Design a protein with these regions (language model features):
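Phosphate- and other anionic-substrate recognition elements at nucleic-acid/protein interfaces
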Residues: 1-135
Length: 135
């Protein structure tokens, strides 16, 4: 049984979820949000992200990281900060010996909902169904 840590990185908050998989069956373990200190410069925020992810890794011992590939953003500053957060998250996982898997947003939506053009709400709805979470 493999344990997978999924991360949706951001410079203000980072979402995460942990599942266990066996074959095509996925079982929900935990999820949450890492809130970063927005009153701090980006460097200390990345430090909080890195150490918070290390705590999650210590507790749940994931084998793999699933993270969305970089996409083009309209705001270059926001894209740069997102890239920093992705880098901190990936570094924390690689530092702990995890395998890193990057997926395009369309690929994730296609796998979860059946269409690469699915909305966030459609993805959220299907994740609840697939992991048997309360509505």
């Amino acid at each position: 049984m493999a344990t997978i840590l999924g991360i949706d990185p951001g410079s203000r908050k980072t979402g995460f979820g942990v599942i266990k998989t066996e074959g095509k069956t996925a079982v929900y373990v935990t999820s949450g949000i890492i809130r970063l200190p927005v009153d701090q410069p980006i460097g200390p925020r990345l430090g909080v992200l890195f150490s918070s992810l290390n705590s999650i890794i210590d507790e749940f011992h994931p084998d793999d990281l699933a993270i969305e590939q970089v996409f083009l953003a309209r705001n270059p500053d926001a894209a740069l900060k997102l890239g920093h957060a992705r880098g901190a998250a990936m570094a924390a996982c690689v530092h702990r010996g995890m395998n890193v898997h990057e997926y395009a947003a369309r690929q994730i939506k296609l796998a979860v909902v059946g269409t690469g053009a699915a909305s966030k709400e459609q993805v959220q709805h299907m994740v609840k169904i697939l992991l048997k979470l309360p509505a």
